[in-house]
Amino acid sequence: MTLAEFCEKIALPDQVVERVLSVPAVPEELLVQLRTPELWPLGRAAVKAYLKPDADGFGELAAQLQCALKTRETYRFSEEIFIETMKCFTRFVVEHLESYGRYGFDRGFWTVRQLSGVLFRIGELEYETRENAIHLHIPSDAVLEPERLRRSWEAARALLGAGEMVCHSWLLSPDLPGLLEETSRILAFQRNFHIFDPEPEDSVRQWVFKNPNLSDEALPEDTSLQRRLKAFLLAGNTFRAARGRLREEPFQ
């Protein structure tokens, strides 16, 4: 598969593809560091140094997409899971557009997990394999319907085997029940976890308001959650994320 074909498979926007294909090939001795967990910081720094200047992160994006093709050569799951997993790149450049009004890539610190074959998109959810547990992540485009979540969980169990599943997310916040209707899908999602260790969390600004740099007063009010969370913050409250252990038979 060529890089252009790969970009088409993951539905990367044409404007981004043009920028990606203009970046020269990055040496394999640098790319291999991006898919080696203990070398992630070193690899990212080396790639950035090799590609300077790198306006809006397109150089790093191109390098990571080149690396993804190397990952594909030894990928342990199906082509479908590989492509769905790597669509994270498309999701992130579109989120950059939503946040800042232009395409860009600023999630290279995260996508090395996908490149290293330790984080997979299986249906609606992502699963990251670590030594002591399987860490569950919720992509921004996940549909939190019980049937879809159950299918994702069952498929993940079949592929990844037994092991405790845990999650750390703003979606598990103990503050959300006071901000959402009882029928909310987010609250239904929460009920599948034993929730513990709430702590202050700023990432909610990115996920709910699409821009982490806005002041409380400037936060948008386009959705009911945005309006309620903005009022919560303006009242001087601190929003918390939390950790959770997935129940044995979730998403019923």
Language-model segments: which ranges?
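Non-catalytic substrate-recognition and accessory regions of acyl/acetyltransferase enzymes
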Residues: 1-144, 161-164, 175-252
